[in-house]
Amino acid sequence: MEAKLKWIIPAVVVVLALVATLDSAGAAPNDRVARGKYLVMVGGCNDCHTPLKMGPNGPEPDLARMLSGHPESLAMPAPPKLGEGPWGVAVAATLTAWSGPWGVSFPANLTPDPETGLGKWTEKEFIDTLRTGRHLGRGRQILPPMPWFNYGKMTEEDLKSVFAYLRSIPAIKNKVPQPIPPDAG
């Protein structure tokens, strides 16, 4: 019996060590989606990519349009001129339009809608976008207030989890406007 324990204990230790070193690439898809949901929530993605609506206690996320970006139906007037001084940014009440020295930017539709969201994006394009700060990893610059430079430091597995979660939510058709460049004059 004692001889068997000499072999069983090291075998169990080896198996546990192997299991502990596995990354979550082999994790079940539901585990990846759950991790992605957690990262989206703590990362504050809803703060800008989900429009606000007025609720009984003031502004609250419009979960019927969760992560669909700036509402297509909400035409924005020209942003106010802020002039010189420490105030350099104007924000729409929905938190889905931002104006500053870069011009006007609108948070993107992160839902899996194939026409207006991330539905046709590959996992690689999503990761490249967050790593490079360029649309689809090669296009136009991602503008403030999107903190791509912070999210781009996430692990590959975390970014894959975020993408998996975004692919799992309901697709919402919502064409977000293109950014508006700053005034030339």
For the regions a language model picked out, list residue spans one by one.
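Bacterial N-terminal signal peptides that target proteins for export
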Residues: 1-12
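The canonical Cys-X-X-Cys-His
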Residues: 36, 42-52, 126, 162, ...
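C-terminal capping alpha-helices of c-type cytochrome domains
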Residues: 120-136, 148-177
